[in-house]
Design a protein with these regions (language model features):
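Short, glycine/polar-rich helix-capping loops at beta-to-alpha or helix-loop-helix junctions
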Residues: 31-46
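Short beta->alpha connector loops at strand-helix junctions that form conserved
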Residues: 10, 33, 49-56, 105
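Extreme N-terminal starter segment of soluble prokaryotic enzymes
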Residues: 2-6
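Hydrophobic anchor at the start of a short beta-strand
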Residues: 26-30
């Protein structure tokens, strides 16, 4: 059983759907996106967090995720919603697993 919050990466239509589904179940959700006005960042079911842009600076994005995860009192679950985040999480899983749970194999 995971007691940490959910971290939804990128607020596309898929991200918004995840935020709503998790939030309606009482899960605390952080919505991460480089654009404050992205779809889903204003949902009542999440706390919006503006991040570096993974496409512009992947290393900075990874550093942000590591720092954000380290600051949580319990391990959050990462929900990637796009190819760039899936690729990064797959490649950097070992480093990120110190601070996060994963929903992907």
């Amino acid at each position: 059983v995971v007691d940490g919050p959910a971290i939804v990466l990128y607020m596309s239509h898929l991200g918004l759907g995840l935020v709503r589904a998790l939030g309606r179940e009482g899960v605390r959700v952080f919505a991460l996106d480089p654009h404050r006005d992205a779809l889903g960042m204003n949902s009542r079911y999440c706390t919006p967090v503006v991040t570096p842009d993974i496409k512009a600076d992947e290393a900075r994005y990874l550093d942000f995720l590591l720092e954000f995860g380290c600051a949580r009192p319990s391990k959050p679950v990462l929900y990637p919603t796009g190819d760039p985040t899936v690729v990064l999480l797959s490649r950097e899983r070992e480093a990120l697993s110190r601070y996060y749970h994963f929903v992907m194999p």
